């Protein structure tokens, strides 16, 4: 799952739409998934019980993963409570989301303020927006390091520059297939591939075909 995050008003919806066109993946919004189960007013971008809503979100994501494991989630790493205090999503929830890539969108506080005013009628100060965005950036870096997940931080207006590796299909000699597919033997591919930006490698047994793994 590709997790696209960033504070409110940074342009995640537009970016996710473009990303879906590029990758062929479906897009889901964290807040929309939560609304399916919880009647909550997100107008002010505040959440009363962050832990409860994240539990709901995880349950909805599990259902999606059963149908389509490769998708895009539009969400946040930090949220506001009903007193406008910034809270991190608990790491235990993030860990269960099975994220393969984090894309964090950022922009200038002035631009985000303008977007929020025009779109939602919200009046957030630039200082508050900067604080909120810095919290999201700091936490994204911590998550990337602790969970060993790739992180790309992009300026919203440069978001078309996001790079994805190609997927390649490689053969396994029959005598090595079982050991490689069960993890007893490492698969070493040709050195010429090392210069490529590879996102996923799929292996298959040349004869007979026993399994394909990603």
PLM segments and residue spans:
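Walker A (P-loop) phosphate-binding loop of P-loop NTPases
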Residues: 9
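Conserved lysine of the Walker
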Residues: 12
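Small-molecule kinase domains that catalyze NTP-dependent phosphoryl transfer to phosphate-bearing small molecules
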Residues: 118, 122-162
């Amino acid at each position: 799952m590709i997790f696209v995050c960033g504070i409110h008003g940074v342009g995640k919806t537009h970016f996710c739409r473009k990303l879906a066109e590029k990758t062929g993946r479906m897009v889901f919004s964290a807040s929309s998934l939560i609304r399916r189960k919880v009647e909550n007013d997100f107008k002010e971008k505040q959440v009363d019980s962050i832990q409860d809503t994240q539990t709901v979100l995880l349950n909805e994501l599990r259902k999606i993963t059963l149908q389509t494991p490769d998708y895009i989630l539009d969400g946040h790493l930090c949220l506001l409570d009903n007193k406008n205090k910034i809270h991190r999503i608990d790491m235990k929830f993030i860990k269960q989301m099975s994220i393969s890539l984090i894309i964090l969108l950022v922009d200038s506080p002035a631009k985000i303020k303008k977007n929020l005013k025009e779109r939602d009628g919200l009046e957030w100060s630039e200082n508050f927006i900067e604080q909120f965005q810095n919290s999201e950036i700091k936490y994204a870096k911590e998550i990337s390091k602790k969970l060993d997940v790739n992180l790309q931080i992009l300026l919203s207006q440069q978001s078309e520059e996001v790079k994805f590796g190609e997927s390649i299909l490689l053969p396994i000699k029959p005598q090595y297939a079982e050991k490689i597919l069960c993890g007893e033997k490492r698969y070493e591919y040709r050195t010429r591939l090392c210069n490529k930006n590879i996102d996923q490698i799929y292996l298959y047994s040349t004869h007979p075909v026993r399994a394909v793994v990603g």
